[in-house]
Design a protein with these regions (language model features):
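Condensing-enzyme catalytic core mediating Claisen C-C bond formation in acyl metabolism
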Residues: 4, 8-88, 196-265, 269, ...
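Short beta-strand segments
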Residues: 39-42, 119, 150, 175-181, ...
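A glycine- and small-aliphatic-rich helix-loop capping segment at beta-alpha/alpha-beta transitions
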Residues: 55, 60-61, 129-141, 164-169, ...
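Short, well-ordered amphipathic alpha-helical segments that serve as non-catalytic structural scaffolds
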Residues: 67-69, 91-106, 266-281, 329-336
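Glycine/charged-rich beta-loop-alpha catalytic/anionic-binding loops adjacent to active sites
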Residues: 80, 112-115, 138-149, 198-205, ...
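Claisen-condensing/thiolase-fold acyl-transfer catalytic domains that form or cleave C-C bonds
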Residues: 96-99, 122-124, 135-136, 141-143, ...
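Short glycine-rich phosphate-binding loop at a beta-alpha junction
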Residues: 112-119, 285-293
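Acyl-CoA/ACP chain-elongation machinery
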Residues: 171-190, 242-246
């Protein structure tokens, strides 16, 4: 059985890399939204549990040869288990399922949707978009704009921002943002490659992050706040880029290769810069919850230290689900709401870093 959760609910750049010497203003990479609410979030949790011990058992030989200890994934990343789809399940079907339940929770019909954005990193082919398959499966009208936003692990928050802007402009009334991920093939390929001869510790650690990935799906409905007084206001947010680090994490279905040390360093420098720049537009120092992209203990602790927020206000789900890419933030948000840890009136921060490097931050008022 599938398990469901539904809730209503720069680094400093050299001068020659700067794109604009003028101060950042709302409406560019900093935005405020006037009349947009998050109406629902729904998630689909994959059936099959794969523990870190299961993966390491399949890598026992190479771990022994490289003199790396068993228990490394849980000790270093904090990931105890992750989910994979069972036989006959696909990430696209899961995304459709989450989308249907998100619409039902929001109280809207497929014909009401004016925009569908898919943010999946996983894709079975280069074209057409994953969005067209989801558009068809969800029974959306021909008038519903549909496309993919691919921006590594930030795609879902980016899509919420794009959708919010289109709602504020009056172009659409309701938007459905969806994401489905399947980590199975990339992990199988990674395990096979690491078990081949000639791999050293550097090779192993460059593919370590692939072993922490998980499968899952999520969807959210956004709509006009004035028509939904019970919705959760999307206040606004910021995005910033440090694309000089574009090659620190490069992935495909064959594998994901990461310079983890430099990615963390560059990512946290960008987070600090974006956080400091956001202070003139937002007061995020004392939010009720900080829902971050889910990667590892190391990443979460670094983010908390970088922006100086209380660790007990930062929920984590990577221990159970691993890194589910763009679905991680909505999965964690839904988990917090379902557990009663986000309540009416709470101020909620969404944020993360995506390979490339980009960061996105957003404020919700529950």
């Amino acid at each position: 059985m599938r398990k469901y959760v539904s809730v209503t609910i720069m680094t400093d750049r050299p001068v020659d890399q700067a794109t604009n010497s003028e101060p950042e203003r709302p409406g560019n990479a900093t935005a405020r939204h006037d009349n947009v609410a998050l109406l629902s979030v729904a998630t689909t949790v994959a059936d099959r549990v794969t523990t870190s011990a299961d993966i390491e058992e399949r890598l026992r030989g190479v771990l022994r040869r490289l003199r790396l200890p068993m228990g490394l994934l849980e000790r270093v990343a904090g990931v105890k288990e992750r989910r994979n789809w069972g036989e006959g399940q696909t990430f696209q079907d899961a995304a459709i399922d989450a989308g249907r339940r998100a619409m039902a929770e929001a109280g809207i019909q497929p014909q009401d949707v004016g925009l569908l954005i898919n943010t999946s990193v996983t894709r079975p082919h280069l074209e057409p978009s994953v969005a067209v398959r989801l558009h068809h499966g969800l029974g959306l009208p021909s008038s519903a704009i549909n496309f993919d936003i691919a921006n590594a692990c930030l795609g879902f928050v980016n899509a919420m921002s794009v959708a919010a802007g289109m709602i504020d402009s009056g172009q659409i009334k309701y938007a459905l943002v969806v994401d489905g991920e399947d980590a199975d093939q990339v992990q199988l390929n990674t395990i096979d490659r690491l078990n081949q001869g000639g791999r050293n510790r550097k090779d192993f650690m460059s593919e370590f992050a692939s072993l922490t990935l998980g499968s899952g799906a999520a969807a959210a409905v956004l709509g006009p706040a004035d028509m939904h007084p019970g919705g959760h206001r999307i206040v606004g947010g910021v995005t910033r880029a440090a694309t000089q680090w574009y090659d620190l994490c490069v992935g495909s279905v064959d594998g994901m290769f990461t310079d983890a040390k430099m990615l963390l360093k560059g990512g946290m420098e960008l987070v600090v810069a974006a956080w400091n720049e956001a202070r003139s537009h937002f007061d995020w120092a004392d939010m009720d919850r900080y829902v971050l992209h889910q990667v590892s203990d190391v990443h979460t602790n670094a983010f908390v230290e970088a922006i100086g927020v209380p660790r007990d206000k930062v929920p984590t789900t990577y221990q159970r689900f691993g890194n589910v890419g763009p679905a991680s933030i909505p999965i964690t948000l839904a988990d917090e709401v379902a557990g009663g840890r986000i309540r009416p009136g709470d101020r909620v921060f969404l944020g993360g870093v995506g390979s490339g490097i980009n960061t996105a931050m957003m404020e919700l008022r529950w």
